[in-house]
């Protein structure tokens, strides 16, 4: 591998970890913060679905949910049938998810601050290409975007580089 490429990869990795570290805070694991942010965008989801999005086993997803329920950030509610349960953020959980997204926005804005408008536009175009290759189906796109501000890539604000993973006609 070219030495310059290794340095670029290292710099991207350092920046990504710094943002995630600051988003999660001291009392939540990254998977717990990701669960809150994901459920903010997808309320009423089940544990199995959440585990898939987070890239966890079913038992790993259950442990994350148990910790969030114990912390008062998440509640289980009856699902559409007698056996199913859905997950809902509590008011405190919603506040924590929104705080994580605000921290993410602030940290990324600070990271981009030294760049000129032209450099930011160039970086956005380059990252569009990189991010578009992260997923080729909906489950992997949801995993890639588990800490995303969903409104930032909404129709009026731009286009999600992973929109190609949405089935024709939209999501069910």
Where are these regions (language model features)?
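N-terminal leader segment of winged-helix/HTH proteins
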Residues: 1-26
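N-terminal positioning helix adjacent to the helix-turn-helix/winged-helix DNA-binding module
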Residues: 4, 31-32, 92, 119
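Charged, amphipathic alpha-helical oligomerization/scaffolding segments
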Residues: 4-7, 11, 99, 122, ...
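N-terminal helix-turn-helix DNA-binding core of bacterial DNA-binding proteins
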Residues: 17-60, 71, 141, 160
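Generic non-transmembrane alpha-helical segments
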Residues: 19-23, 103-107, 111-115, 129, ...
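Charged, amphipathic alpha-helical coiled-coil/dimerization segments
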Residues: 66-121
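C-terminal regulatory/oligomerization modules of transcriptional regulators
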Residues: 121, 125-172
